[in-house]
Amino acid sequence: MRTAAYSNKICKFEKIGAFGCETDFTMDTIHQRFPQYDEAGQALIDKAYAIAAAALADETRGNGHPFIEHPINVALIAADEIGLPADCVAAVFLHEATRKHPEIDLRAVRSVPEHVEGTAGQGTLSPETQALRQAQGPKLKGGFPEDVYKMVEGLNKIATIKPKDTRLEAESYKKLIVQYSTDPRVTVLKIADRLEVMRHLEMFPKASREKKILETLMLYIPLAHQLGLYNIKSEMEDIYFRFAEPEQYRAITNKLKATERDRIRLTEEFIE
């Protein structure tokens, strides 16, 4: 039954695209989102996105948007704001696909012959991987570099551990993140993931939101500082303050706006 349901998701994706008729995140527009990569890098991203879009076709976020929006946003942070290479962008998509659907065997996709006639050559594949191949065709031919698989495995391991709301647990969790990050880029991708979540905190229920801002304060802000991601650290601190102390945040931002208006007025008067 699980295989049949999964195949239906893929067929739905084939008909209406990753986001459905109301959005423009098709394979072509995803390709255009990452112009900084060469042809090989874009092909890698296209393959990873095809898997994620099929796997996540029926998943939605708390705001009702398709869940694929989350890995797309994380991938854009990794590419545009941090400057990570294409294999990291591919790892973002594959992580979310396999986190939601651990039955997907990414390494099996790599072993599929370049040309498959009928059902020949598919005997070693899981039903889910066969469904992916049938739905996406040439987009999935070939596999991924070994470092991509390792990054995905690291991200998936980190996703299974849940920190407690204490500083001692936070320190232990930070150590686990580093331990599971055999490739240091895994930690950077996890920070990019958290930044995307923080930018969309409004969609989460209050209890979940409070848990996430506390995790961010204790875990991700210190990690971002350690790695020299100072812009991301500052933004997460700002979002934390906005949700943890909303009244103080509004008072400070209003004062800053008033100061900015005064500065602009004085500048204009000086120019005149």
Regions found by a protein language model. Give the residues of each.
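Active-site helical microenvironments for divalent-metal-assisted chemistry
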Residues: M1-V116, S126, G137-E272
